[in-house]
Amino acid sequence: MQSKFSTFGLPGMMLLTFAAMAPPAQAETVAYNADLKGSEEVPAVTSAGVGPAEITYDTATKKLMWTVTFSGLSGPATAAHFHGPAEQGKSAGVVVPIAGITSPIEGSATLTDAQAAELAAGKWYINVHTDANKGGEIRSQVVKK
């Protein structure tokens, strides 16, 4: 009686061995940024407020990390969030609240696979709210560098 493995032959067995030894997919850190301004809000807001955001996502740990810096707002920031999924010019709900409202804001969160896919597809935005602009004073889509 023949073994199941003898039907593969030597080349087949070598292929299976090499496939089993292949290294796992490499994790990477993906860099994103955002350029927050009033004209990006929906609807647009007249504001002298501006702010860059530097964002990274680690594919191994699923950790999103950010630094959001802003100035020129109509008053103190009252809230800040990541929203999605939404294309530029569209609105969506909060997906990750940003703790702290004093510039610069630094923080992190662990994403689900679905959230990471939305982020990678450019479907997330950040905005910063004030009392004068409760819906958001400055906003920007999060884009890969």
Per-region residue spans from a language model:
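Bacterial N-terminal signal peptides
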Residues: 11-20
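Metal-centered catalytic cores of metalloenzymes
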Residues: 2-5, 23-80, 84-145
